[in-house]
Amino acid sequence: MIRQCLHLTTSPLLLLLLIALSSIGTVVAKSDGPKIASIQLETEPSMPFYFENSDTVLFLRLDTGEVYQSFDGGVEWKVLGKDHETEGETAGLANGAVMIQAHPYDNQKAYILGRHGVHWVTTDQGKTWREFEVPAAPSMFNEPLRFHGEDSGKVIFQGERCSAFACVETSYYTRNNFETVKPMRDTARGCMWAVATPGFADSTTEHAEEIRDRVLCIVHGLKNPFASAYRLVYSDSFFEDDQDGIEAKLNEGRPVAGIINAAARTKYIVAAAKSQGTDELAMFVTDDAITWHRAEFGNHKIEESAYTVLEGTNYSIEVDVMNTDRSTNMGVLFTSNSNGTYFTRNIEHTNRDMSGLVDFEKIAGVQGIVLVNVVDNWEEIENDPKADRKVISKISFDDGRTFQSLKVKDKDLHLHSVTAFENIGRVFSSPAPGIVMGVGNTGTHLKSYTKDGDLYVSDDAGVTWRLALEKPHKYEIGNKGAIIMAIKDNDKPTKKIQYSINHGKDWETAELDREIIPYFLTTTPDSTSLKFMLVGYVEDPADWYIYAIDFEGLHERECKDSDFENWPARLDENGEPDCLMGHKQFYRRRKSDANCFITETMFKTPKPEFKSCKCTAEDFECDYNFVRSEDRKECVPATILKAPEGTCKNDDDTFKGPSGWRLIPGNVCTRDGAVELDKEIDRPCKDALKTPSGDSKAVSSTANYIETEMFGEFFYLERAGSSRGEDETIIMRTTDGKLYVTHDHGKSWTHELKDVKIQQIAPHRYLNDRAFFLTSGKKQYYTINRAESFDAFSAPAEVNPSGLTLGYHEEFKDWMIWTGPGECSHGECPKVSFISKHRGDDWEILLRAVEKCEFMAREDRKDSGSLIFCDQHEGEKVDGQRMLVTSNDFFATSTTPLTNIIDFATMAEFIIIATRNPEKENSLKVDASVNGVEFADAEFPYNLEVPVQLAYTVLDSSTHSVFLHVTANNKMDQSYGSIIKSNSNGTSYVLSLNDVNRNNGGYVDFEKLPGLEGVALANVVSNTKNVEKGSEKKLTSMITHNDGSQWTLIPPPAKDSEGKPYSCGSDGKPTDKCSLHLHGYTERRDPRDSFGSASAIGLLFGVGNVGESLGSKSEASTFFSSDGGISWKEVKKGNYMWKFGDQGSVLVLVEELKPTRDIYFSTDEGDTWEKYQFSEKEVTVQSLSTVPSGTSKNFLIWGKETGSSKLVTINLDFSGLRDRTCNLDEDTGESEDYYLWEPKHPLQEGNCLFGHVEQYHRKKPSSHCWNDWSEAHVHRISHNCTCTEEDYECDYNYERQTDGSCALVPGLLKPNAIDYCRENPEAIEYWEPTGYRRIPLTTCQGGKNLDRWVSRPCPSHEEEYQRKHGPSGAVIFFAIIVPITIAVAAGYWVYTRWDGKFGQIRLGDGGAQSFVTSRGDSPFITIPVAIIAGTVAAVKVLPLLVMSLWRSVTGYVRIPGRRGPRPYATRDAFAARRGDYTHVVDDEDELLGDDEFEDEEGDERN
């Protein structure tokens, strides 16, 4: 309901006077007040806005979807599509709107977005509206409309298309203002135009043709759906020529993963990236959409949701960076140089709020004037965040170089700013030149808005201030400063409005027709109109009122030239016009006492005039690769300068080099007779970059002796891709509890926490910079900055003696779970889990009598932020039956989905729970969940010949399916079992490989190769019948290239490393008598080692032999493959350890546990090997390590000097081998230094693997350069292939035949396919089983359709079935075979293109421990992971560093968890370090299940 009224405020006396004056012919027609009209609404008006330079205003009623429009500033209103039949309107507009958006650069255009794909546009300020359709709803996560900064007809529409399973963000574009609309592409975080602002268009005229149609989009990773893999891609053809686009070269000519946001600011585009394993952001900036640079903030760390890009200028970016804990909300204000690359600190302790808003505003229209609020008592707030903060206001007149107090005469003035703003629009200023207003108080600091606030005004851009009105007011400025309106704002009803026509010196009063509580006051964005709109409500929230207040009648005279002044926008300390950016700025503005209004040119925004100045030092900035010195007086090199070729023959020479200064681009100062800081200067050659020699002599070694008996554990705290710094940090604990730290990869070590004995190191599972150092007492220590400093907290209990002590949260970095022994008077004390949300500052009890509790949060697991799983004893008794207890509210309430459990483990999206089988004595069964809410029994294949399931090992789930090892024999030295593979929700399994080797500790000889989809190696026991009789195992190595669907022997090389043939007569093809066999995971000294590295795709090492079966390690040779295991060659006789450097540019070998002084290295993918002597004395090498990502040029040898007890670490530095970075052309893929390598299957043509062809950059072996890339990178998915038999595997109850087909297991019935309908009531159809199912990883399209031949309608859905597609209709791609809801993060796109590489999990069947690893953007984690058996809980802890002489019962190496990258010691295979890790137990009697079942069997025998 709308009620309208109009009244004119006049006094009777003045009315009589006006009548009398008119009767004698005087031309005076003033009114004594504004005209006021109002309407009443039943709900709050939303999204009000004026068309700039007009009196046309719109707002939206959210409850009805109605759009209200007025052409006279709010006097008369109509509902579009309802009240009037205006040209172009349609009936759907009457109640179909969800938002209104004005075009930011074209004041004629606005858009109304509807609910159901129907939208409207106006190109004439609302006079007419035109309907257009886009088949998507407006995006809820991205800005629905993105505008072009030069051509207002170009608009990107960002929407979402939803299915029953998920919503997909997608973008459309128009080049003619939605006359036509075309789809562009699916996105992750939306798209934007490169030319996104008019300022960008003006500053890039030289690139106009190249970037005119360029679009930038944040899209999913090629193989990973999570934010850590998001990419920034661009296209100049709306992705028509190339569907994926070209990745933007953000960092030194290389793409960057983890793009979380991109935005345009004036003449810049800013992109933020966050790598996995860190909370630190990297910011990248471009001013031409072609060349990008990383923005440098000195030593300040930028975190997600902890920085704010503020309103900048056309020559700099303003960023406020939080520099304290989030609870204190204070920041540092930075200003960039002109290309946005180097930021300098302007002012510290800026006042922020929890949402990231900062008390900062640039004065509109005036260059260089900035208002900020800072926290005066910042030290007190940092010590006590709950203390009252004392905020003070500061102003700068020189672009933030210096700040001073605001003054009312001799008193300091403090104003409420953005964080406490009580209106809409700008806070202090408007386009009205020089008029600045605010609510605040004088005194020592800012006080209460309501109780102490008054309205203050300045008409000289903040130089001087005066009291305008007592008490707080909402205020607006109109007619370019000629009229100021205000209404009291103290949360009390009022009917009085006040206005001033002389810059706030004097005020008049008018009254509304009723008292209201003001909600907001606004006018046209350019502050040119004489009309204002006031919105308020009475105490009943159902009664809202909109007032249109028109001051046009106050004066009738139009301002003349004599009514204007030439006002200088900035004054120096002497009161003279000041220079900035090489000019002085002036405005022609109405004098404050002029008795006139500006009506003829009312809607023209004031424009400044400029006068040039001579260049001074302030007109220069630091050149690229230079930064300000500490005293800000010089520009010093940010990197070592390179001398020109032919110069610097001696260190005493000099060369002509840059001064470090440059004139700020856009600065218009005159150079004649002025300062010239940018002239070249003489620089000393001794400070120039020395070119590496490029030969083997350039390899260096640095030895350090550690005074201890044995190394204990060590971890790399590797910098993630978005982290700043150059360090390569390792933390190491010795067996006597000493902590050593190196920041230069072992070239030097320091002893830290000298008075503390460290029992364990527990690196943070998700953040590389963090690690915790656990002691035997309550006081514990940690670092959050890669061991630069250390802090302490008090633990709620002692360290867990038999399991994981600390658990970490994936999203909330300071949330932790501590599990340790509770207090009791006698006997075994039950364990208690505690939670802290503040990094150990305080603790609360989660649950008592537990084995473990874990956070279950995952980015793709809906509503899992507070989800916690606990393994608890029933009745809180130590000997009580164990049950799975879950909660989403920290156990204020809880559920118990499963009882009588043995353990649970998480692996990528899967949660696997082992429980006792109630139907089979002494046997286990598996339950699975994806969403953490619904659980289902796992269906094992009937041809799985394991009558009593004694233990499980969860091997891998990196390819949308779980590999599970089911133990068939767990007797000492006889263990083996079958590997089965699940469907996409972990509940239905098929047999993959029989008789796979398992050791006494429960670990399995199975390993996925890092970075290669579907490639795995396993060792099988070839003589199981003899083993059952007590014979020694004979192992045979097998390999799969299609994710376990088919296994083959490993092809042997034709000749050995000496060119001799093998005795078994190898011809390069594997046979039962002659194939390659490799020692696997169960024989590794260090469980973090792997065959390959995720950063060196396709490069593999292994130790083994060629023959009929696997021989002894003492007689083994070292083999190498460069094509992902398809072919191999012997590179060395003997047992060598290996590591990969610089993504495979350097391969290093060193002999294991034999005295040596030499290593071998290759720089040509293993074709040739050079020897390097690293020590004069022989060293027995116990381990060889490098950064987990395999991207460093440094390696570290850990060993003992032969013949002595001295422990030594030796750093090997290869950085001097090459003198340049390889040239990469990401656009074309190949270049002089790179070729594109495609993984392939040895038995398939066309390099198709899992339905697509992948391409990776590989450095050419002949190129003498460094990759210098921090992460492995897929160049592109070349194309999807047509489906073949290799894209299918045998379905449940079917098995592979000798001819390769799948047939029903004899004696079994086909699965009852109609069960799917019962389990999924909304399903329309089901498919008759064919014996085949698609491999979850495949993305093939078309071709052979082996899994869906005949579809049937589900009962009660026959009509829908016929309507949908009939017998051959669309496939329900996400079919779920058992009653469990799959948690899908990104819909069909994610399912078909994500390989889910998140590693492997180990639930140990020993000593209540588990072993879990994971890998986010990196392909695979290779450690077999979950072992479950018996009755003792398996808990996630790190496996013991299995190096002889280093093991101890209490020592273990903790490696971080699932999402990484995370720090751990040596395993290249965990390139980005994603994983959970668990304790590898020395005491095998503690193994889960094995000994208990044996005891029971023994009892029966007795």
Swiss-Prot record:
Task: List the carbohydrate attachment sites.
Answer: 314, 339, 985, 1280
The family note in this entry says: Belongs to the VPS10-related sortilin family.
Gene encoding it?
A: vps10
Q: Which PANTHER family match?
A: SORTILIN RELATED, SORTILIN-RELATED RECEPTOR
Which superkingdom heads the taxonomic lineage of this protein's source? Eukaryota
Species: Talaromyces stipitatus (strain ATCC 10500 / CBS 375.48 / QM 6759 / NRRL 1006)
Q: Where in or outside the cell?
A: Golgi apparatus, trans-Golgi network membrane; Prevacuolar compartment membrane
Keyword annotations for this protein, in alphabetical order, are: Glycoprotein, Golgi apparatus, Membrane, Protein transport, Receptor, Repeat, Signal, Transmembrane, Transmembrane helix, Transport
Q: Name one Pfam family in it.
A: Sortilin_C
Q: What InterPro entries does the entry give?
A: Sortilin_C, Sortilin_N, VPS10, VPS10-sortilin, WD40/YVTN_repeat-like_dom_sf
Q: Which residues form the signal peptide?
A: 1-29
Q: Which residues lie on this side of the membrane: Lumenal?
A: 30-1369, 1444-1502
List GO BP terms, alphabetically.
Golgi to endosome transport; Golgi to vacuole transport; protein targeting to vacuole
Gene Ontology cellular-component terms listed:
cytosol; Golgi apparatus; membrane
Instruction: Identify this protein by name.
Output: Vacuolar protein sorting/targeting protein 10
